[in-house]
Amino acid sequence: MKDIISRHKAGEHIGICSVCSAHPLVIEAALSFDLHTNNKVLIEATSNQVNQFGGYTGMSCDFRDFVNKIAREVGFPSERIILGGDHLGPNCWQGEPAAEAMEKSVDLIKAYVAAGFSKIHLDASMSCADDPVPLDPAIVAERAARLCQAAEETATDEQKRHLTYVIGTEVPVPGGEASTIGSVHVTRAQDAAATLETHEAAFRKLGLNAALERVIAIVVQPGVEFDHTQIIHYQPEAAKALSAWIEGTPMVYEAHSTDYQSRQAYWALVRDHYAILKVGPALTFALREAIFSLAQMENELVAPESRSRVMEVIDEVMLNEPGYWKKYYRPTWSQAMADIHFSLSDRIRYYWPHPRIRQSVEKLIANLTETKLPLGLISQYIPVQFERLSLNELAAVPHDLILDKIQDVLRAYRYGRAI
């Protein structure tokens, strides 16, 4: 990370795409995409995905071993993987008193650092049960400093060579917006400056001067966001003052919720010093598109009694267990079903680990692996992949088609020079 940031600050048009997903096919797609380059691949886990209690993926910081296992299968060198932790702080424990939530947050940070995660987002921006709303920025900074102190005490000297921190409080809701958005507030330059100033003071108060040298980025809102049905696109002019301010610091910006922006927007974001671009739902949205397309092919090619019924299984599970989508999607039945299937916030992603859904996806892939896929069907349902088949760049097998569909998202970031 430090090398990429140094190159950017030296004037090179370079950034990095942060892959925020715990889905094995997304991780495999990201590693395969850069298998034959010298690029680093940044893979991040959020605190609600991976924590000391398991998170919604059921994984603790053994997520590192999970990623490394996929890397070995792909043939990707583990030394080219950067592991990051996103929203590390009280996010998962906002319903608890601050003292208890922070105690768990400290343990969370220690677990991530001990496991070898080297990019740490110190996010203490959320109010806990006994906190005022919103939380005083000075309190946010003090709590972030306490989390940083835990990281510094845990890291070995070797780990500190690679350890980096991201600070900042203007973060989109972890997991996605719960309502529709009409517009988005671009962070003011003076607010970014205040964030840095309060964090520097809090760090120094705890004697964390050396740790300050490891702070590489500030999270801000450059004016990009999406909800279930719409996208707020980057407007460089609206963020002009913010983009200029960071040039006077040794840091860059980190932008969250950059999913679904145009290729040209990624190029402009990197140019304007939003050098760490986070993507998550767009990757699993592409995965979902590929699986739905393959399900349509299965209906054409496989006898009814042998089909995976993957789409029906997804519906059954999500309707029986609505906890991950109910408060986010529209209440009318037809609208809710459209959201379940096609929402840009892609809350299906929380259900892929479910045993019934996982088994049905495995059966879908097995069924179509045993069946020759007609080119006409591929053209009908995934035409971009059909073009690559025609150029002999891709094999007509389900696994490869899914990976390539996910990699279409990564290609847009690569166009913007987010390696």
Curated annotation (Swiss-Prot):
InterPro entries: Aldolase_TIM (IPR013785), GatZ/KbaZ-like (IPR012062), GatZ_KbaZ_carbometab (IPR050303), TagBP_ald_GatZ (IPR023436). GO terms for cellular component: plasma membrane. Induction: By galactitol. The keyword Lyase does not apply. Pathway: Carbohydrate metabolism; D-tagatose 6-phosphate degradation; D-glyceraldehyde 3-phosphate and glycerone phosphate from D-tagatose 6-phosphate: step 2/2. GO terms for biological process: D-tagatose 6-phosphate catabolic process; galactitol metabolic process; phosphoenolpyruvate-dependent sugar phosphotransferase system. The keyword DNA-binding does not apply. Keywords: Galactitol metabolism. Disulfide bonds: none annotated. Component of the tagatose-1,6-bisphosphate aldolase GatYZ that is required for full activity and stability of the Y subunit. Could have a chaperone-like function for the proper and stable folding of GatY. When expressed alone, GatZ does not show any aldolase activity. Is involved in the catabolism of galactitol. Belongs to the GatZ/KbaZ family. GatZ subfamily. Forms a complex with GatY. HAMAP family: Tagatose_aldol_GatZ. This is D-tagatose-1,6-bisphosphate aldolase subunit GatZ. It comes from Klebsiella oxytoca. The gene is gatZ.
